[in-house]
Amino acid sequence: YLVFSHFHYDHIQGLPFNYEIFDPSNKVTICSGLVSAKELREVFVRAFQPMYFPIPLVDTLKNLKFVDFSTVQDDMTKLCTIETIELNHPGGAAGYVVEKNDKKVCCFLDHEYGQVDKVDNEMVRKATNCDLVIWDGMFLDEELPPKKGWGHSSIEQGVNFSDATNCKNLAIAHHSPARTDEQLKEHSNNLKRDKGF
């Protein structure tokens, strides 16, 4: 299963470079909590047509299957529960909450925290006492003001959110592409905590 939060290029452009999808024995089910299967298929048809990619990817690969998110939820019933949460991102984005037994993981990438109370409050409700929050750490707090409306959060907001919700572990992801490995190590050391970074 490939579950997409949204369809900005940084999230979809890697699909045709995963050569496993070209093996017809690999059945690839694609869904999103943001749009229907029909709309999702059309997104990928448009994104990977010959003007942007050498072959019409969706029509060429018969092993790609586009389904509604509810289909994946039904398929996963015996394994886990998975639900969506609306995120604040230009064009829309879906976060995901996955639960199995007494374990819960919340994935909140591509969200601009602190702008829409209703969304933020729902995130807090879902993440309270969870096992892992995967957080959008595109920016630092000091970088946020000129980036208002870009749909991303800061590393520090992730740490504060993690503390406020008493989640057990925090994974900061979706870092700025301009951030170097050395800078990421420095931020990790500066924010060292028992819950992880």
Language-model segment annotations:
Residues 1-106, 117, 123-124, 181, ...:
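Binuclear metal-dependent hydrolase catalytic cores
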Residues 6, 110, 174:
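Active-site glycine-centered loops adjacent to acidic/histidine catalytic or metal-binding residues
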Residues 34, 111, 176:
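Residue-level signal for short, function-critical loop segments
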Residues 105-110, 144:
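Short, basic, glycine/proline-bearing loop/turn elements
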Residues 115-197:
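Cap/insert and terminal regions of metallo-dependent hydrolase folds
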